[in-house]
Amino acid sequence: GAIVVSHRRNKGLAETFRSEMKECLEQKADIIVHTDADGQYHPLHIPQLIEKVQEGYDLVLGSRFRGKRMRHMPFTKRFGNILFSKVLSSLTKVRITDSTTGFRAFTAELAREIDFINTFTYTQEQIIKAAKQGFKITEIPIDSRRTRKSRLFKNPFQYAVKAWINIFRIYRNYEPLQFFGKIGLSFFS
């Protein structure tokens, strides 16, 4: 059977993710598989995610951009994801092609070690913090289904602004000298 954890009212993606990790750790899970509730990700990829964790990876992302082309994803979302992924790849020194995927598997150790500060989303924060703390990250190609319009993120621009703020905050916390140094240098350029 499954253990279902729910909130009486919508607390957002990040809080739901935190509750999920807490419950999984209380249940003594070794590997945690996360998928969004909208049915976008096909569960037949779950064994592949778990297999990669068993091979020694700490965080395995299901990438919608490795392999097949994402024709059903709106252009603005696709463009934003590619841009986020390039920035995250640069910050983490790990090749990331799908930084907003909600389909991932990770170790209990990673769940215990990463403390989330964001109240908005968890996707980029988990990747950055896992990389900065030395956890091994990889991706597997997955298929995804077209889903209805997002109820969480009605405005892609608003999502992008909040996500960029989150990325800058994490970068500032992990690399303060580089972060403030680059800001300072920009004033003297």
Regions found by a protein language model. Name each.
Residues 1-5:
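Acidic donor-binding segment of Leloir-type glycosyltransferases
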Residues 36-40:
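The conserved acidic donor/metal-binding loop of glycosyltransferases
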Residues 7-27, 31-33, 43-120, 145-157, ...:
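Acceptor/aglycone-binding surface of glycosyltransferases and processive sugar-polymer synthases
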Residues 93-94, 117-189:
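Hydrophobic helical membrane-anchoring modules
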Residues 41-42, 140:
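Hydrophobic alpha-helix-in-membranes signature
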